[in-house]
Amino acid sequence: MNKKVVILGGGTGTSTLVRGLKQFPVDISVVVSVCDDGKSTGKLREEFDIPAVGDLRKVIASLSDTEPLFESLLEYRFNTNSDLNGHAVGNLLLAALCNITGNMSDGIKSLSKVLNLKGKVLPLTEDNVVLMGLMQDGSTVEGEHNITESKKRIKDIYYKKNPVINPEVIEDIKQADMIILSMGSLYTSIACDLISKDVTDAIDASKGKILYVCNMFTQPGETDDFTVSDHVQVLNSYLGKRKIESLIINDGKIPKKFINKYHREEDKDPVVIDKSNLNNMNLKIIKDDFVTLDLGSLKHDAIKLSLKIFEEIIN
């Protein structure tokens, strides 16, 4: 029987992870935060009163086992002067299926059959949630997009109204052999999955190991100047009684030209590995060179990363 893995996250980082992990003999459930409110997703949320679909779409595309053309179709964005401008086909498809089936979870299950998904994709909630940010300067910012765009340091996040958590999320977490906090936006993709007590209670009740894959670069508006231990401390502050047990970090050399490029164009810098702080955190630290180049962007090597995770799962 395959080991059960629950991944909490969303967006590009989680998509990279599942693209590799689906190649291994594990049962994957991906819990996706649904508080994104920018671009196409924001328009659809406002018009149809549905959970955010953008991160769900990315993870579904990465888990699919079908013709590459279908994955390209899900990710295709219209560039037109009409009302379709900026919308991704996958976002429209999920919005339509949500209306047809009556909820997002059933809509995703219908699409999963068509795309032969190598795992489950679970929205954290069916509610049209609004993420709130309490900033270090005492101000409050409403909405995920506004939180990151405010360029203020985040002190805390919470939901404007506490959502009803998807029961399948709770059940899968309790049965998991490993719970992975994915690389990705620290507050708006991962921590926002942990701010519900129902989720942290389920993690506390689970016997699954808690593993965190740290980002390679900081993210403007969320983790400026953060070290690896800063990332861990933030996530541990949102977890319940149980904390992160294993940590995967990249110690591969990042080419100088990419460090300069990311700093200049995106205001991102490599996350510093602060060994002295990490050594005092009671963590199993797994280091390797995970750097790879994909279409001109630096990413974690999905297969190499997944192999390390699989070794942890079976040990």
Residue ranges and their predicted role:
Residues 228-315:
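C-terminal functional extensions of proteins
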Residues 193-200, 226-231:
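Charged helix-capping and loop-helix junction motifs
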Residues 1-5:
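Extreme N-terminal starter segment of soluble prokaryotic enzymes
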Residues 29-33, 209-216, 245-252:
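Short internal beta-strands
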Residues 25-26, 206-210, 244, 283:
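A short helix->loop->beta-strand "cap" motif at the edges of active sites that frequently abuts
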Residues 13-18, 183, 188-195:
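Short glycine/serine/threonine-rich phosphate/pyrophosphate-binding segments
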Residues 35-151, 308-311:
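Electropositive, gly/pro-rich neighborhoods at or near active sites that engage anionic ligands
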Residues 127-183:
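Active-site gating loop/helix substructures
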